[in-house]
Amino acid sequence: QGIEGYYEKALHGTTGYQEVEVDNHGRVVRLLKEVPPVAGKNLYLTLDLHLQQYIESVLKGQRAAVVVVDPRDGGVLAMVSSPSYDPNPFVKGIGYQAYKSLLENPDRPLINRVTQGLYPPASTVKPYMALSALSAGVITPNTTFFGAPTWTLPGTQRRYRDWLKTGHGMLNVTKAIEESADTFFYQVAFEMGIDRIHEWLSKFGYGQSTGIDLNEEYAGVLPSREWKQRVHKKPWYQGDTISVGIGQGYWIATPIQMVKALTTLL
């Protein structure tokens, strides 16, 4: 389980042994072959114990996930999934009732929410959408857009609301990020289209495992035309693209993916 399970072979090393000849009384007569043991390798963690303990105390009694990384090298300084469970009963073999209780707990303590919790990334993706649109030439730093309270999908009567009921007024990309203006990113998503969105947002690690050295990790979903057809047997609609523009709709990600995307941006 966890980090020890991932590095079991490296930590365990190799067991040594001897092949000997014995007499009819079981006494060793001579040594035929000897293979000395090889010690396991040392493992140095990046975790900050005090930071880990502090976050655990803050999250006590809550359902939440927190992961803190060093943006310089991606090292994990703290990782907390709450509520958690006591791993000690698993060492000697946990009883049926105790294990059943953990499985049926509605707070799902056996799930590592950092690597297995799947959530819409929501407005956290707006900086990545902006950078992608800038890089693709869809917008420039000087592009302006009037952020009304709603945005209408061209050619339809379908309206999408902004979180700010009064709207944001005239926006450029910087102000749109600062104010988390939904309508600006509806327009950006519409102009980019789902194919380019999928291509660019994949560069930030969405829809794929992060490579963290833990076995329990979900890849999440960065939706595409092919994904929707394969999973839902339905075509992709423009309205689907608009929701993706603000990190909603079919898009789901883990907290560790979200923090990796941020370190990629930094």
Which positions does each model-derived feature cover?
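Conserved, well-ordered alpha-helix/loop/beta-strand core segments that scaffold catalytic motifs
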Residues: H25-A65, V69
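A generic alpha-helix structural signal
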Residues: Y7, I55-E56, L201, L262
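Small/polar-residue-rich segments within soluble enzyme cores
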Residues: Q1-G40, A78, V259
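Beta-lactam-recognizing serine transpeptidase/beta-lactamase-like catalytic domain environment
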Residues: V22-L32, R72-S123, Y128-L266
